[in-house]
């Protein structure tokens, strides 16, 4: 009985801690002027791996509601160019060197995703499949989605370019990692602090496209 009570107390403490973390990043995003807390995931990965630079050409897939676009604007500056694509619209005032298309990325031609007819430096994908609640099934759906993004990156990224995708933890992640290794000199698995610890989401980063 004592052990059961202790487990319940520990579970409650854990839930309260996770709620505080979630609330912290939610309120921080509002305070910092970002439309979503997901911006801090990209910021952490960028700071650790020097992903985004001034003047970069960036493709942001699954860009709505626009937090990653906001952060990217700060990083690439006026000389950079950014194209965002999402099934949903983005209700943000963005710099003139930014363009957002409301479309299905996989219905578009490769040339439609080029920026001013040139190759891309960085592809960001915060896309996720429709989930079922069944962990293995969701991991497989995420794997299939990211395979398509990886195929696109082969055609769109310049040599030494980078690809960041959101994935779900599970057996297929290692296969996806191996497939990334065929196209990138370095492959990293990233679990940002702002990503809830109980979440199965993880980010896969390919650096220095071969």
Regions inferred by a protein language model and the residue ranges of each:
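Class I S-adenosyl-L-methionine
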Residues: 171-210
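Conserved class I S-adenosyl-L-methionine
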Residues: 55-62
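Conserved SAM-binding loop of SAM-dependent methyltransferases across substrates and taxa
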Residues: 65-76
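S-adenosyl-L-methionine
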Residues: 90-117
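Conserved SAM-binding motif I beta-strand of class I
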Residues: 81-86
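Mobile active-site "lid"/loop adjacent to the S-adenosyl-L-methionine
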Residues: 118-158, 171
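Short glycine-dipeptide loop
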Residues: 78-79, 157-161
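Class I SAM-dependent methyltransferase Rossmann-like catalytic core
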Residues: 9-53
């Amino acid at each position: 009985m004592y052990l059961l009570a202790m487990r319940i107390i520990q579970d409650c403490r854990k839930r309260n801690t996770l709620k505080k973390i979630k609330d912290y990043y939610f309120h921080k995003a509002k305070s910092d002027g970002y439309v979503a807390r997901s911006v801090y995931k990209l910021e952490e990965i960028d700071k650790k791996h020097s992903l985004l630079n001034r003047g970069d050409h960036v493709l942001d897939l699954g860009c709505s509601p626009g937090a990653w676009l906001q952060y990217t604007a700060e990083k690439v500056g006026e000389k950079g160019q950014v194209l965002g694509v999402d099934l949903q619209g983005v209700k943000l005032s963005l710099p003139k060197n930014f363009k957002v298309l409301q479309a299905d990325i996989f219905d578009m031609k490769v040339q439609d995703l080029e920026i001013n007819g040139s190759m891309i430096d960085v592809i960001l994908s915060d896309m996720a499949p429709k989930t079922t609640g069944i962990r293995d099934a969701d991991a497989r759906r995420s794997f299939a989605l990211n395979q398509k993004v990886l195929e696109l990156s082969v055609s769109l990224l310049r040599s030494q370019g980078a690809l960041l995708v959101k994935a779900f933890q599970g057996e297929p992640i290692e296969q996806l990692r191996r497939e990334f290794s065929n196209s990138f000199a370095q492959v990293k698995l990233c679990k940002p602090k702002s990503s809830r610890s109980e979440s199965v989401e993880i980010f896969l980063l390919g650096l220095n496209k071969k």
